[in-house]
């Protein structure tokens, strides 16, 4: 199981780093911060599918 620790999120501003992650909603998130903010916004319904683009 792949997992990302989102305990420090949400954050008001994300960097522009490009290290894509694929969410369980089949959306490619550009980096961990953007992904974790989406996870928090979704109340945990979005999870990490895999690292890299969907």
From Swiss-Prot:
CDD domains: KAZAL_FS
Molecular function as annotated in GO: serine-type endopeptidase inhibitor activity
Record keywords: Disulfide bond, Glycoprotein, Protease inhibitor, Repeat, Secreted, Serine protease inhibitor
Site entry (Reactive bond 3), positions: 16-17
Domain notes: Avian ovomucoid consists of three homologous, tandem Kazal family inhibitory domains.
Glycosylation sites: 43
Source taxon at top rank: Eukaryota
Compartments where located: Secreted
UniProt organism field: Haemorhous mexicanus (House finch)
Every Kazal-like domain range: 4-54
Record lineage: Eukaryota, Metazoa, Chordata, Craniata, Vertebrata
GO CC, one annotated term: extracellular region
Disulfide bonds: 6-36, 14-33, 22-54
Pfam family, one: Kazal_1
Name listed for the protein in its UniProt record: Ovomucoid
């Amino acid at each position: 199981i792949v997992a990302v620790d989102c305990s420090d999120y949400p954050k008001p501003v994300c960097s522009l780093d490009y290290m894509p992650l694929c969410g369980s909603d089949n959306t490619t998130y550009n980096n961990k911060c953007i992904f974790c903010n989406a996870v928090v916004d979704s109340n945990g319904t979005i999870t990490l599918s895999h690292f890299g683009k969907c």
